[in-house]
Regions:
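Glycine-rich phosphate-binding loop plus the immediately following alpha-helix
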Residues: 6-47, 160-164
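Adenine-nucleotide phosphate-binding core of ATP-dependent small-molecule kinases
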Residues: 61-90
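Glycine-rich phosphate-binding loops at beta-strand->alpha-helix junctions
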Residues: 83, 93-127, 131, 147-151
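Active-site nucleophile and cofactor-binding loops and adjacent substrate-binding regions
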Residues: 11-19, 79-81, 103-109, 143-154
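Acidic-glycine-rich active-site phosphate/pyrophosphate-binding loop
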Residues: 1-4, 54-61, 112-138
Length: 195
């Protein structure tokens, strides 16, 4: 039913590693960029190239091709940031419009300046396109924040959720039960789901 109230919808990438730090790590290692340099790499004003963001393997393939064409590492990484952010905006919003204020969470957003800059460049475009009302006198980029400890928010949420669970949930029940689950239980669960 329509209530006229807005609903907060926390969301995490659940589709593919293409929108995660794992892809950044893998491509960064291939390009041999020191971590300290990666953290300071920019996005603003850097030439972008088409990179698939839907799949980490596709992104890596595109980056490999661009690298062979002589595209410099700063342009490769900025293009990867763009691909990841655009994919995440598609997957995470699931057709909804992000409301101000947006929190950027997770390690890549915490540590990599170019990722933060990319979000701050792309989210305001969506707000403008969709006519989202923003607080007066506040630059749109200031409504996109990376809180202290952003890299730990998912873990903190898991802990908070776990505090509400029964004390027996998540306790190690011995090798026998683990072995049973790996050899039998997992297959039984798949069969129940029709898999």
């Amino acid at each position: 039913p329509e209530t006229g109230r807005k609903k907060k919808m926390p969301s995490m990438n659940d589709k593919c590693a293409g929108g995660t730090g794992a892809v950044i790590d893998k491509i960064n290692a291939k390009l041999r960029i020191p971590s300290e340099q990666l953290c300071e790499m920019g996005y603003k004003g850097v030439k972008l190239h088409p990179v698939a963001g839907k799949c980490g393997v596709f992104a890596e393939t595109d980056i490999n091709g661009l690298q062979k064409m002589g595209v410099p590492p700063d342009e490769l990484m900025a293009s990867l940031f763009e691909a990841i952010v655009m994919q995440n905006l598609s997957v995470l919003t699931r057709g909804n419009t992000l409301l101000p204020v947006v929190l950027l969470l997770g390690g890549p957003n915490c540590y990599i300046k170019g990722m933060r800059d990319c979000w701050k460049a792309n989210i305001p475009k969506i707000w403008e396109e969709r006519g989202t009302l923003l607080p007066e006198g506040v630059p749109p980029e200031d409504l996109i924040k990376t809180p202290d400890n952003a890299q730990y928010f998912a873990a903190i949420g898991s802990v908070e959720f776990g505090k509400s669970e029964d004390d027996t949930v998540g306790q190690y029940a011995g090798w026998g039960k683990l072995e049973w689950y790996v050899t039998v239980g997992r297959e039984e669960e798949k069969a129940k789901r029709g898999g």
